[in-house]
Structures are given as structure tokens and as C-alpha cells.
């Protein structure tokens, strides 16, 4: 995949888990990687130092803050003079089952989840698209979830936010196609990351793995491969596609 050589790739929430695997994959194929992080400075800097190649950078950002998304895109353009690929990966998951939560906590869960998982990515899309429209090319890939379609009874705001990502992405795919801008979605099921490790222990872990007929969960590297696949120029006609990666644990008709 030499076509990624010297391409400028932004990965939000890129310091760990799926974002880390995506950063490693793009760097391996010669891209210049920019990752943003909210709190994990040490992890982000360690990752940047370990990536093959050069010109990779990381910086702190919280795109739920007003003006932050524009700052992120402007900073990248100022440094590199371009922005070729955007991966909206940053997200959050917080339990808030309606049967057990107080209303004030319910409201906080909804507002924080939607701000992080939907509004933040929408703002990044807006400012990235403005640049990409000016140069008539670019790719935006948003990370969604199986929960957008299957439902999340313990975290309904999470499911709603990811359903919003799907709808937004397909709307933008139509709006931006005349500008030669690709917009796609990768929607993983349960993925084995450091954050998810505690959920994969014992009987709970067995039950999660058994959701898939493959009797396992996904690997971050598998998600990264799907992102790379959508990012190549030969996939332009797949704009608007939502790629499910969940080991057949949930199949849409």
C-alpha cells in the first residue's frame, strides 16, 4: 500500500486500543500520522516514538470544547500543508441502565456521550471537509459500533450516538461525493483492548465470546485493516458504506 506514503492521516483518540492499531498500520505503510488524545499523554508520546518512519506527531485535544475541532484541523494544515485522511475514532462508553439510574445521572450520561461520540466527530468532519472541498479530495472514516443497530440496553446513549454516526456519515457521503471526498464507516463488535480486558474475564468473557459463532472477539489490528481498505483510492465507489466487523455476532438484513 505505497499509496499511503507521505499521506497526512489524523486519528482522533489514537493513543490506545483501536486508534493505536490504526496509527501503527498507517505508519507502517508510510503515512505521516497525527494522533490526538484527551488524557493519555504518556501513552500517546510513547506510541509516536515507536512508529516506523518520521514526521508523526500527537497533541492533546477535547473536541467537545467549542472551537477545538477547528483548532485541530488548522494545526495540522499549518504544519503539513495538507490533510488527506481523517479517522474519527475517539469515543466513550458509560453504563446508564434506565432501570437503575437517577434522572440527573441519566442526563449527564446522555449529554457527555453524545458530545464525545457524535457532536465531536461531526465538528471534525465539518472542518476537515472544508479543507478537503477546497482541494477536491480527501477521505473521512468514522468508527461506529455494532450497538448502532443491535441496541445497547445498559448504555442507550452509546447506541444512539453510533446510530447517529452512521446516519451522519451516509449523509456526508452524498453531500461530499461531488468534491471527490470519500466518507465511510467501520462498525466493530466487541474488540479486545486494554479498556475491555476486565469484561473478558470468567463467565462474562465467555458469554461475550460466544456471541460470535467464531467464539472470540475482534482484534484492534482487524479493525485497522478494514480502515486501511476503505482508505485506498480503489475503494472510492464504496463511499457511504458501513462495514460491519463483528464476527457474525449481529447480522443486518
Where are the regions a protein language model picked out?
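Residue(s) in the substrate-gating loop at a strand-loop-helix junction
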Residues: 145
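Active-site helix of classical SDR
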Residues: 125, 161, 169
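Catalytic Tyr-X3-Lys loop
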Residues: 92, 103-122, 137, 141, ...
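Conserved mid-core segment of classical short-chain dehydrogenase/reductases
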Residues: 70, 93-111, 134, 154-157, ...
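Alpha-helical segment proximal to the catalytic Tyr-Lys
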Residues: 130, 174-175, 236
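Short C-terminal tail/terminal secondary-structure segment
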Residues: 150, 228, 239-253
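Short, small/polar-rich loop/turn modules that mediate ligand/substrate recognition or access, typified
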Residues: 177-182, 238-240
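Conserved glycine-rich cofactor-binding loop
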Residues: 8, 15-17
Amino acid at each position: 500500500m505505497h499509496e499511503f506514503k507521505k499521506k497526512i492521516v489524523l486519528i482522533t483518540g489514537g493513543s490506545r486500543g483501536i486508534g493505536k492499531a490504526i496509527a501503527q498500520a498507517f505508519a507502517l505503510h508510510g503515512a505521516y500520522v497525527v494522533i490526538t488524545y484527551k488524557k493519555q499523554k504518556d501513552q500517546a508520546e510513547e506510541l509516536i516514538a515507536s512508529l516506523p518512519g518520521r514526521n508523526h506527531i500527537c497533541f492533546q485535544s477535547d473536541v467537545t470544547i467549542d472551537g477545538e475541532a477547528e483548532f485541530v484541523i488548522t494545526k495540522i494544515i499549518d504544519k503539513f500543508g495538507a490533510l488527506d485522511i481523517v479517522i474519527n475514532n475517539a469515543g466513550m462508553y458509560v453504563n446508564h441502565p434506565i432501570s437503575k439510574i437517577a434522572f440527573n445521572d441519566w442526563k449527564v450520561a446522555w449529554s457527555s456521550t453524545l458530545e464525545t461520540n457524535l457532536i465531536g466527530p461531526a465538528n471534525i468532519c465539518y472542518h476537515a471537509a472544508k479543507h478537503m472541498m477546497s482541494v477536491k479530495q480527501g477521505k473521512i472514516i468514522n468508527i461506529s459500533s455494532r450497538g448502532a443497530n443491535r441496541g445497547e440496553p445498559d448504555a442507550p446513549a452509546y447506541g444512539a450516538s453510533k446510530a447517529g454516526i452512521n446516519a451522519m456519515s451516509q449523509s456526508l457521503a452524498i453531500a461530499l461525493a461531488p468534491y471527490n471526498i470519500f466518507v465511510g464507516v467501520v462498525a466493530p463488535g466487541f474488540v479486545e483492548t486494554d479498556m475491555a480486558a476486565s469484561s473478558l474475564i470468567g463467565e462474562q468473557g465467555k458469554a461475550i465470546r460466544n456471541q460470535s459463532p467464531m467464539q472470540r472477539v475482534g482484534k484492534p489490528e482487524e479493525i485497522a485493516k478494514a480502515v486501511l481498505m476503505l482508505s485506498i483510492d480503489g475503494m472510492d465507489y464504496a463511499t457511504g458504506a458501513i462495514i460491519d466487523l463483528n464476527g457474525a455476532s449481529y447480522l443486518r438484513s
